[in-house]
A protein has these predicted regions:
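Extended alpha-helical interface modules used as scaffolds for assembling large macromolecular complexes
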Residues: 33-40, 101-313
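N-terminal membrane-targeting/anchoring modules of bacterial envelope and secretion proteins
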Residues: 1-66, 72-76, 90-109
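The feature marks the first
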Residues: 54-58, 68-69, 80, 265-269, ...
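A short, conserved structural fragment
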Residues: 1, 79-89, 219-230
C-alpha cells in the first residue's frame, strides 16, 4: 500500500483531523436492517466480466434482478482499477483478480478503490451532474470520510444525516473550498437541472457525496450496512462493519471461505455452480453455454450445440 494511503488506517489516525464522534446511536431493536452485501461483489464482478466478453451487459439487470445502476457502478470501478481495456473487455489483470483467493481479492479491491485517482464518487452520485473541465483530487475527500467512519464504533447504528451534519460542522471544506463553491459547475441531475453554486448548497453537493459513498459504494464493498428506522422509514441509518478495518488495514485479517466446490454437470448439459466454485472457472465456462439463472447463491448455464458453436467462432 502506498505510504500516503496509510493515514486512513485504524492504527494511525491523525487525531487533529478527526471530528469528535458523538453521534446519537440507535438500538438494534429500532432498526430494520438491509441484508449485508458481504463479499458478493466478487461474484458480481465475475458475472460482469463474463457478460462483457459475450456482449451481454444490457441483459444483466433482467437476468439478475439487480438494477442497472449497480452494474454501471461495477463497470466504472473495473475501468478505474485497470481491469478492462479501451473496448471494455477484461484484461489479463481481470483474470489474475478472478484467480485470487476471496479474502485476498476483496482486500485488493477495497484498497485499490480507496487509493484510486480515476474513480470519482462526485461525478457518479446519481442526483448530481458535473459539467465543465474543472478537475479535483478524488483521493483526499474519500480518505477523509474513511478516516471519520473508521473512528466510529463497529456494529453501531447511526443516522446518515447525523454523520453528514457532523462533517458539515467539523470540516465542511473536505471536498470544495474557497472559490471551488462557485467555479465547479454542478447541477441537479433531474429535469430542473438546478445549479448548485455556493456554500448554501453544501448539503446538496457534499451531502450527496457522503450519502452515495456510504449507502452505495461502501455497502457494495461489504464495509458498511444500511437500514431504516422503525416508524421513520425516511431516515437511512448505517453501521460500520468489522470488515471495514479488515479490508483497509495492511495488518487486518479477513476470513472468507475458499472456492473449493465443483461444477455440477448434468447429463443434459446443464452446469450448476455456487459462489464457491472458483470464479475463474465460472468466467471461462460461461463463454460456452447459454445463461439461464443468475442468483446470489446459484448460477445455471446450459450447454447447447448453438452455444458451443458460438464459443468456437
Amino acid at each position: 500500500i502506498p505510504e500516503e494511503f496509510l493515514e486512513l488506517l485504524p492504527d494511525s489516525p491523525r487525531d487533529e483531523d478527526l471530528p469528535p464522534r458523538q453521534l446519537p446511536a440507535w438500538a438494534e431493536a429500532k432498526v430494520i436492517a438491509n441484508p449485508a452485501h458481504g463479499d458478493r461483489v466478487l461474484d458480481d464482478l465475475c458475472t460482469l466480466f463474463a457478460a462483457l466478453r459475450m456482449d451481454m451487459l444490457e441483459q444483466l439487470p433482467r437476468m439478475s434482478g439487480i438494477q442497472t445502476s449497480y452494474w454501471q457502478l461495477l463497470l466504472i470501478l473495473s475501468k478505474s482499477l485497470d481491469l478492462l481495456d479501451e473496448h471494455q473487455q477484461p484484461k489479463e489483470n481481470a483474470r489474475v483478480f478472478l484467480g485470487k483467493p476471496r479474502s485476498e481479492a476483496l482486500r485488493w479491491l477495497a484498497q485499490s478503490w480507496a487509493n484510486s485517482h480515476a474513480f470519482d464518487e462526485l461525478r457518479m452520485a446519481p442526483s448530481l451532474r458535473c459539467e465543465g473541465t474543472w478537475q479535483h483530487d478524488t483521493i483526499a475527500p474519500r480518505r477523509k470520510i474513511l478516516e471519520w467512519l473508521n473512528a466510529l464504533p463497529n456494529l453501531t447504528w447511526f443516522k446518515v444525516e447525523d454523520f453528514v451534519d457532523d462533517v458539515f460542522r467539523q470540516q465542511a471544506d473536505f471536498l470544495r473550498s474557497g472559490a471551488d463553491y462557485n467555479t465547479w459547475i454542478i447541477s441537479t441531475s433531474d429535469a430542473s437541472a438546478r445549479l448548485l453554486h455556493g456554500f448554501e448548497h453544501w448539503r446538496d453537493v457534499e451531502g450527496q457525496y457522503i450519502r452515495f459513498l456510504i449507502a452505495q459504494v461502501l455497502v457494495y464493498l461489504g464495509m458498511v450496512r444500511t437500514g431504516k428506522l422503525l416508524n421513520q422509514s425516511e431516515d437511512l441509518v448505517f453501521q460500520v462493519l468489522p470488515e471495514f478495518s479488515g479490508l483497509l488495514s495492511p495488518d487486518g485479517s479477513l476470513e472468507l471461505p475458499e472456492e473449493d466446490q465443483s461444477v455440477l454437470v448434468g447429463r443434459d448439459g446443464k452446469l450448476e455452480m455456487t459462489p464457491l466454485v472458483p470464479r475463474i472457472a465460472r468466467y471461462q465456462l460461461a463463454r460456452f453455454a447459454e445463461w439461464r439463472t443468475l442468483q446470489a447463491d446459484r448460477y445455471v448455464f446450459q450447454l447447447t450445440p448453438a452455444s458451443l458453436q458460438a464459443a468456437g467462432e
